[in-house]
From Swiss-Prot:
The lineage of its organism: Eukaryota, Fungi, Dikarya, Ascomycota, Saccharomycotina. Belongs to the SDHAF2 family. Transmembrane segments: none annotated. Interacts with the flavoprotein subunit within the SDH catalytic dimer. It comes from Kluyveromyces lactis (strain ATCC 8585 / CBS 2359 / DSM 70799 / NBRC 1267 / NRRL Y-1140 / WM37). One of its GO terms (biological process) is mitochondrial electron transport, succinate to ubiquinone. Its main location: mitochondrion. InterPro entries: SDH (IPR005631), SDH_sf (IPR036714), SDHAF2 (IPR028882). This is Succinate dehydrogenase assembly factor 2, mitochondrial. Plays an essential role in the assembly of succinate dehydrogenase (SDH), an enzyme complex (also referred to as respiratory complex II) that is a component of both the tricarboxylic acid (TCA) cycle and the mitochondrial electron transport chain, and which couples the oxidation of succinate to fumarate with the reduction of ubiquinone (coenzyme Q) to ubiquinol. Required for flavinylation (covalent attachment of FAD) of the flavoprotein subunit of the SDH catalytic dimer.
Amino acid sequence: MLRTVFNKPSVLKSGVNSITKQCRSLHANAYLLNKGNSNGAEGQDDDVTVRIRIPPIKRTGESLDKKRARLIYQSRKRGILETDLLLSRFAAKYLKEMTPEQLEEYDQLLNELDWDIYYWATENYSITPLPDRWKNSNILKQLQEFSKNKDREILSMPDLSKY
């Protein structure tokens, strides 16, 4: 069956044409998104051209136990190893003791981009500047202190029993 499809030049040609059209369309859309995003220097574009912000899900009536369980999961499953290790260890140490207000603040922090959280926690503001909304955050200050790893512990994902 496959042999007959690929032996017909018209079928193969139409498939290639379809892929070519899709690639051109994607390239055109990328050009339109990037257009006008220069950083002030003529002919130079930002390294990050588009940031799409997806609003977080509004959770109403969530119990504290459910919120803690969700925050544990979100701290452990970020997608970037560095942030996973940092946030999962932080959650294992502090999440049980957090007040409802602190849990809400931590929840809002987890809605930020992974690399932003990592650079803010490690106080590397030259790469990702700290927004005003986080400058007075007690949770972020606690995370920054925690990220210094003053005890020089070997970082590994904490066991779920630690939460």
